[in-house]
Amino acid sequence: MSHQHILTLFNLLPVATNISTWWNFGSMLLTCSIIQMTTGFFLAIHYTANTNLAFSSVIHILRDIPNGWCLQNLHSIGASMFFICIYIHIARGLYFGSYMNKKVWMSGILLLTILMATSFFGYVLPWGQMSFWAATVITNLLTAVPYLGTNLTIWLWGGFAINDPTLTRFFALHFILPFMIMSTSSIHIILLHEEGSSNPLGTNSDIDKIPFHPYHSYKDLFMLTLLLFTMMSIMSFSPDMFNDSENFSKANPMMTPQHIKPEWYFLFAYGILRSIPNKLGGTLALLLSIMILLLPPFTHTSHIRSMTFRPMAQFLFWTMITTFVILTWAASKPVESPYITISQMASTMYFLFFIINPLLGWMENKILNTNH
């Protein structure tokens, strides 16, 4: 069989000539999924979902299993890389108006939600101090639900406190959810190829398309090499870069860490949660910080799809990215002044982006119509 026939699948996929490096993160996310599922499977073989043995089983993987340290660190760093890629992927969608392809965008938000749940359950599994207390704080938010809250929390915990049943079910969920991620990813990709991907100009690219292979496949391969190189470098030189030092101690329900916080990739949402002094209000704001991403396809007002030719929208977008970084930083700090005020201001700025952006689009349309 000729080289051409083997790659028919890729050759039959027409892609816009001008898609930039920002379009490579989808394939990088798929690679992250494969790495996570492979390393996760081998870790699950040696892991014990028991409150007395979980922490010891992780130490056993690191010390006694051949290349166990490599598996564990790859899985841990891979999770951070997964979130870096998905946040860039979402930011690209917001900047270039990819959200106008509604079905793809909605399936993407569903994917993000499942991924966040998966990583939260995974963070609890080592049963370190921060694992235990982060799980306690986050699951406790369910008690904010009126009438049903307490019953829901007890049902989730499998008892009146976080204990063995909680860890067992979290392990089961952490194992099963990646299969949901893979199936939802397939739907996401199928829906994308129904219409085709957008391009940096936000124009219709039907008149100017080239085969995916070899033009874009090599570009993808280059970014994948960079991703793997970054992961291997962190694993070799600074494997605990993304870890919390509290998690090197076994979970102790009798001793609370000085500053409870989730993994770095949840800090922006945690910052929004913390900035509201009311429990129910904070929980709603936490949910809204993700669910608000469902709005842009319905609130897009500008005649121009992409922000490439919209300088004011670009300024607004980069303000939002800065806000995201500030929220992440402030949430990693103790709950004291000035961090409380900074978190509150940044949270307001974060939500304002989704309100100001459509107004800005409407204003741009007015200016363009006036000039005509």
From Swiss-Prot:
Any GO BP: mitochondrial electron transport, ubiquinol to cytochrome c
Binding site for heme b b562: 75, 174
Keywords: Electron transport, Heme, Iron, Membrane, Metal-binding, Mitochondrion, Mitochondrion inner membrane, Respiratory chain, Transmembrane, Transmembrane helix, Transport, Ubiquinone
PROSITE patterns: CYTB_CTER, CYTB_NTER
One function term, GO molecular function aspect: ubiquinol-cytochrome-c reductase activity
SUPFAM superfamilies per UniProt: a domain/subunit of cytochrome bc1 complex (Ubiquinol-cytochrome c reductase) (SSF81648), Transmembrane di-heme cytochromes (SSF81342)
Binding site for heme b b566: 89, 188
GO cellular component: mitochondrial inner membrane; respiratory chain complex III
Record's cofactor remark: Binds 2 heme b groups non-covalently.
Listed cofactors: heme b
Membrane topology label: Multi-pass membrane protein
InterPro entries for the chain: Cyt_b/b6_C (IPR005798), Cyt_b/b6_C_sf (IPR036150), Cyt_b/b6_N (IPR005797), Cytb/b6-like_sf (IPR027387), Cytochrome_b (IPR030689), Cytochrome_b_C_euk/bac (IPR048260), Cytochrome_b_N_euk/bac (IPR048259), Di-haem_cyt_TM (IPR016174)
Location of the protein in the cell: Mitochondrion inner membrane
Positions of transmembrane segments: 25-45, 69-90, 105-125, 170-190, 218-238, 280-300, 312-332, 339-358
Residues given in the record as a ubiquinone binding sites: 193
Family, as annotated: Belongs to the cytochrome b family.
Function field: Component of the ubiquinol-cytochrome c reductase complex (complex III or cytochrome b-c1 complex) that is part of the mitochondrial respiratory chain. The b-c1 complex mediates electron transfer from ubiquinol to cytochrome c. Contributes to the generation of a proton gradient across the mitochondrial membrane that is then used for ATP synthesis.
Note: Heme 1 (or BL or b562) is low-potential and absorbs at about 562 nm, and heme 2 (or BH or b566) is high-potential and absorbs at about 566 nm.
Subunit comment: The cytochrome bc1 complex contains 3 respiratory subunits (MT-CYB, CYC1 and UQCRFS1), 2 core proteins (UQCRC1 and UQCRC2) and probably 6 low-molecular weight proteins.
Stated name of the protein: Cytochrome b
Organism placement in taxonomy: Eukaryota, Metazoa, Chordata, Craniata, Vertebrata
Gene name, Swiss-Prot/TrEMBL: MT-CYB
